[in-house]
Amino acid sequence: MSIYQSIQDFISLALQNGTIEPLDELYHRNQLLHFLGLNDWAEVDKEVHETNSLILMDQLLAIANENNVIAKGQDEFYEAALMNFMTPRPSKINHDFWEKYQASPDAATQYFYELAQQVNQVKTRDIARNIAFSHLTKYGKLEITINLSKPEKDPKAIAAAKLVKASSYPACQLCLENEGFYGLGNKPARSNHRIIQVSINGEDWGFQYSPYAYFNEHSILLNAKHQPMEINKRAFDNLLGFLDKFPNYMIGSNADLPIVGGSILTHDHYQAGRHDFPMAKAELRETIELAHFPEVSCGIVNWPMSVLRLASENQVELSKAADDFLKKWQVYSDESLQIKAKSTDGTPHHTITPIARIRDGKYELDLVLRDNNTNEKYPDGIFHPHPALHHIKKENIGLIEVMGLAILPARLETELLEVERYLLNQDNQMNEIHKAWAEQLKNEEHFTRETVHATVQGAVGEVFEEVLKDAGVFKDTQEGHEGFRKFIDFVNQ
């Protein structure tokens, strides 16, 4: 296919998705020719030959490279700017989204998600590189991923970034100002990034899809203002308010304290999507009567972390009950279990990771109790993956992992292959950090070429289960169960 046919097909897709109108076609073509380093044109078939936007993107990037129009280390920025030629303006997308919303929230999100994939805002090819498997436990089937989707920085890009003058704009990667931002140094390319403006409880928010999604239709609800995250009654109201607008999605928030929180605490945001997480499938271990909230049902979830599940048709009462649990947890201590609400200087250590969904006609809130205390034995966190597990997972346990989906580092792709070679007594370059674990596996089982891969994956799943147990404040033991009931009694006073 000729370069001009590729360009024409690219323009045809832009016409089809509403980026341009027929009267814009010549103008759009000329702008694109200049962008690709071309100054000529040959008439081609108007019938579309290639409908895959990513294949066309590759073809046009090859043209740009041949014409030397992409500066060293600028590939990511140029690629996003190229796809911006196929991405409707924010006003057009918002108009179409809310028009489709009149039919159903599902129609609106489907439109936006499909468009985000077409224009490479959601990087489907990178996401497809992730390694995924599951592991069955007594709590249900845990989901494990080795995250390979975020590409390693090219050395030229790293060198170029060092030469860029520091900028405070946008203030962070979650600010609305990222929409259409070309990119700069270590600030990602967002030329083709689009955000839906939405009002939740009278506040302005932005709704976008995550470029490197960790689960189906992984989306982010971000505050229009750059302000810190905070778990409080307003947060519960926001989660439930989002469900009123998008009942087809679940939504949750990272905790708002270091160690137990996510990687971005400086910008108020939540994460949503269409995925039935393992924790959502978990049954209740026991039910609880709430003395002060008769309209709210409650139970302890059968899960390695400490989770309360609240449900009600009454959104107002549900939010009040969640807030009551939060406030009581923020002052509750049980030092026999190393649970301590505050330091002597008043530093808070207790918060909640909340998750909201609609199930069987009721609003549901899962409240995961978090404690970020440290001590001499566990300087990274008492309720954080303990050192023996750091060879697999040492990062914070955030919202997604709390719900039973492990996001493991890319290094494990090659490191686990070396572990397999070690277990088969083959020449290997196994990282020393896996030695004790691999020795233990070797002593427990005989390995063959046919069984080693699945067995190592199962062992990784067991490590993730232990990670979640470490993060649980009330352990799944008789002592832990008794401690949990004492806390419930405190709440019911």
UniProtKB/Swiss-Prot annotation:
Pfam families: GalP_UDP_tr_C, GalP_UDP_transf. It is an enzyme of class 2 (transferase). Keywords: Carbohydrate metabolism, Cytoplasm, Galactose metabolism, Nucleotidyltransferase, Transferase. The keyword Transferase applies. Pathway: Carbohydrate metabolism; galactose metabolism. It catalyses: alpha-D-galactose 1-phosphate + UDP-alpha-D-glucose = alpha-D-glucose 1-phosphate + UDP-alpha-D-galactose. The keyword Cytoplasm applies. It is found in: Cytoplasm. One of its GO terms (biological process) is galactose metabolic process. Its EC number is 2.7.7.12. One of its GO terms (cellular component) is cytoplasm. GO terms for molecular function: UDP-glucose:hexose-1-phosphate uridylyltransferase activity. Belongs to the galactose-1-phosphate uridylyltransferase type 2 family. NCBIfam families: galT_2, PRK05270.1-2, PRK05270.2-2, PRK05270.2-3. This is Galactose-1-phosphate uridylyltransferase. It comes from Lactococcus lactis subsp. cremoris (strain SK11). The lineage of its organism: Bacteria, Bacillati, Bacillota, Bacilli, Lactobacillales. The gene is galT.
